[in-house]
Amino acid sequence: QTLYGSWAGAFGYFQFMPSTITNYAIDHNQDNMINLKDNEDAYPSAANYLKKIGWKKNQPCFFKIELQENIPEKYLNSSARNIKNKRKIKFLKRYIKNFDNLNIRENLTAAIIIPDKDIIPGAKTLSPAYIVFENYEKILNWNRSLRFALAVCTLKERFNNEI
């Protein structure tokens, strides 16, 4: 069979690159074919990938936050290429308006992302904003898109830590 991928070469529901297929995709339904457009292979392959890259099952991925206006620009990340200025939550919380409504352990290291800042003309500089953790960065190793990582992490919440 011929595989057809996206313009960048990714295949299936979870956009696996050829090397990712080789290293992480599994024939979960044991029909002697890995089909990444079939739920029986695609979802277990994605779960296998996350497990192998070091996903921490009981740690958060991100929280949507509201930022204080006084946050220094250096703490705002808008590129997936290099998440910078990671700090402990106990430091970053001073810049988060809705911190008291979040259930975050203060000893975790995190960064702040503003995904719309550099690509949407006229986007509000501080909204939407997210505080992201190590699991989020694991997803960026899979696909260097801030939005892709947010989508995967949102699905993770829907699956209640089953992956």
Briefly describe each language-model feature range.
Residues 1-120, 124-132, 136-163:
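Catalytic glycan-binding domains that act on GlcNAc-containing polysaccharides
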